[in-house]
Amino acid sequence: MGWIPPNGRWLLVGGFEKCEKGGHAGRAAGDATCRLAYPPSVSNGAVARLCFAATFVIAAFSLGLQFVLDWLGVWDDPNIPGPSHAVRIWRFFSYFTTQANLLVVMTSLGLARRAGRDGPGWRVVRLNALTGITITGLVHWFLLHPLDDFRGLLWASDTLVHIIVPILVVLGWLVFGPRRRITTRVVVLGLIWPVTWLLYTLLVGRITGWYPYFFLDLGQSRPGVVALYCVAILILLFVVSCLFWMGDRWLPGRQPGRVATDGEPIDAPRLRPARRGR
């Protein structure tokens, strides 16, 4: 980085800065101005967008497969009459796994279109997608996976939404970011969705008698046990959010800036002119 004359510029060549100077020899150094041009973050690259696009396709396909299987009643006990299609749809979208994968689909599509996407609301949604899909993978692996005995399409669908998609999302964030998106405010606001989901699940379950997960079922467990599970889930969500927050601060990568096709930085922060030496 350095100071360059008005008609000089920083060119970004192979990810490194190169100063192209073409100022008039007689121009005083005190008149010089420059812009600090950050090298483009890796999250701005075509590889990053391709990764996010692949995550979007796999997550959307996985969610669609789950929906079709649920619509057809493949998961149902053949000895018990199944619910109506309207109830199936409502239950499908009541699962935390479904909502987390939906957030992944939306955010992955947004990042596939523009890898450096940003905004106050977007940051919260992106963190919800990261924490939600991570919790989906952890809870499934340690609590639900030991109880599963699926085969064929059931196994494939279950593995995709609970294991493959979480791994892709976390790896994509580790490699491509984008970074400098998570703040204390974002972490706090990110808790609104899981708290709302828990309250909704317990209230609707109390009314209808149906719960998406056995550990939240007040008909099978005492209220104190369910309360402990809820507290544990929220603590786990908060811890995972803090881990993403710390990674966002410490892992390599910087907030990407826009760079025109000719290498001229568009929105790089400006620095004050350098003072003349005395």
Report each predicted region and the residues it spans.
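Perimembrane loop-to-helix junctions flanking transmembrane segments
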Residues: W75-W90
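Interfacial segments of alpha-helical transmembrane regions
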Residues: R117-I133, T183-L191
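Interfacial helix-start motif at the membrane-water boundary
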Residues: V87-L103
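N-terminal membrane topogenic signal
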Residues: P40-A54
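Non-cytosolic membrane-interface motifs at loop->transmembrane helix junctions
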Residues: W122-V124, D148-V161, T184-V186, L216-Q220
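Membrane-interface transmembrane-helix boundary segments in multi-pass integral membrane proteins
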Residues: S43, V47, S94, T208-F244
